[in-house]
């Protein structure tokens, strides 16, 4: 109406619709996959964590949760462990993600390894790790990080940065360097127990490769036919074993075992 608003800075903002990246780093076929999702994740994690590949924090992932009412939230977290049971992170249980993990114990992790043109998407349930696991990890943390866990009432509103700095100074006086810092009762680990683990490899013309390990429930009596029937007809393979590390060669699953299928998804 009267020209640009003088109160709005004249920024040279690139048009996001025109930003495009061609993906040509590799391809992913079923024959490239390891027998289990945990072995496949380990192989890709090694690639991402290799110095010089351009991934600054290979263990950084976006962790999405939702409230009991279904309102989502997401944040970047740091993976602190993984095995056939799932992926472990640590947090203040009173934080938003900690509360939502209790109210609605399902979530997702996305590992965005841009430099490799790869991502891994995990979807599953959330459980707390044992107190012993939490204690072991907390005592391995640097002294400053231990004090930080005590200092921050995560996700609460504070008046200023001074609140944190003053609290940290008080804690440093209480537990100086070299003193054992107790593990806060309100702080601990969360394990994301996967139901699906998708491995995504960028390809040309947006025709990306997406291969997903999906858990299929098997009755304890070994009657697996009905469970297999619900697998998608385009499943590219079947893995039998525990939640990522059992017998991949077949056999009758036991109550402690899971059946996994590998599926290709359209990009």
From Swiss-Prot:
Residues given in the record as substrate binding sites: 20-23, 80, 137, 141, 145, 206-208
UniProt-listed Gene3D superfamilies: Electron Transport, Fmn-binding Protein, Chain A
GO MF annotations in UniProt: FMN binding; pyridoxamine phosphate oxidase activity
Disulfide bridge partners, by residue number: none
Co-factor binding details: Binds 1 FMN per subunit.
Cofactor(s) listed: FMN
EC number: 1.4.3.5
Domain of life according to the entry: Bacteria
Binding site for FMN: 75-80, 90-91, 96-97, 119, 154-155, 200, 210
GO biological-process terms attached to the record: pyridoxine biosynthetic process
Pathway it works in: Cofactor metabolism; pyridoxal 5'-phosphate salvage; pyridoxal 5'-phosphate from pyridoxamine 5'-phosphate: step 1/1; Cofactor metabolism; pyridoxal 5'-phosphate salvage; pyridoxal 5'-phosphate from pyridoxine 5'-phosphate: step 1/1
Annotated keywords: Flavoprotein, FMN, Oxidoreductase, Pyridoxine biosynthesis
Enzyme class name: oxidoreductase
Protein role: Catalyzes the oxidation of either pyridoxine 5'-phosphate (PNP) or pyridoxamine 5'-phosphate (PMP) into pyridoxal 5'-phosphate (PLP).
Record text on subunit structure and interactions: Homodimer.
Name used for this protein in its record: Pyridoxine/pyridoxamine 5'-phosphate oxidase
Lineage, uppermost ranks: Bacteria, Bacillati, Actinomycetota, Actinomycetes, Frankiales
